[in-house]
């Protein structure tokens, strides 16, 4: 009786340990071959080049130094918040035609497989089941400067 109780206890412990380890793992937001590059961009939104980012819903491609391997898509989500997307498709490995593009000012599209996301939220709407990779930013409303980093 003690032996079967001991075996049952060990078996139960192993099952719960396995469930705990697997359920607490981090969710992958991109495919494993997604390029990892440092991001450090400062945008002065007072400059004419960034005029489109002064209105909610406005967006701009950023292809400056330290803006990733294919650049960024910066979207003004509200008067004080921005969405910063990597232009690499998050659901497939980098290849020809996997650079994300904005279409009709409302969606982000991957030309390779026509995966789509909502521009303002990053929510997937077709093909992909993960949002575009996003980056952190700080916005100083007094100086109208946006700092993007990773």
State each model region's role:
Residues 18-23:
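C-terminal motif of bacterial Sec signal peptides marking the signal peptidase cleavage site
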Residues 103-113, 124-137:
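Short cysteine/histidine-rich metal-coordination sites, predominantly Zn2+-binding motifs
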Residues 27-105, 118-119, 133-150:
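N-terminal pre-ligand scaffold of iron-sulfur
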Residues 13-16:
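Non-catalytic accessory regions used for complex assembly or targeting
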Residues 1-11:
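Bacterial N-terminal signal peptides that target proteins for export
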Residues 1, 24-25:
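A generic structural motif
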Residues 24, 89, 110-113:
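Short cysteine clusters
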């Amino acid at each position: 009786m003690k032996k079967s109780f001991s075996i049952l206890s060990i078996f139960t412990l192993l099952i719960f340990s396995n469930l705990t380890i697997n359920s607490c793992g981090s969710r992958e937001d991109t495919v494993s071959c997604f390029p990892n590059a440092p991001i450090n961009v400062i945008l002065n939104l007072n400059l004419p080049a960034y005029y489109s980012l002064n209105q909610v819903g406005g967006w701009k491609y950023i292809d400056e130094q330290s803006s990733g391997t294919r650049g960024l898509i910066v979207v003004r989500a509200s008067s004080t918040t921005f969405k910063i997307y990597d232009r690499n498709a998050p659901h497939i490995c980098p290849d020809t035609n996997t650079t994300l593009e904005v279409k009709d000012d409302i969606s982000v599209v991957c030309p390779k497989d026509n995966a789509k996301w909502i521009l303002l939220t990053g929510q997937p709407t077709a093909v992909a089941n993960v949002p575009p990779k996003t980056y952190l930013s700080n916005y100083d409303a007094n100086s109208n400067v946006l700092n993007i980093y990773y």
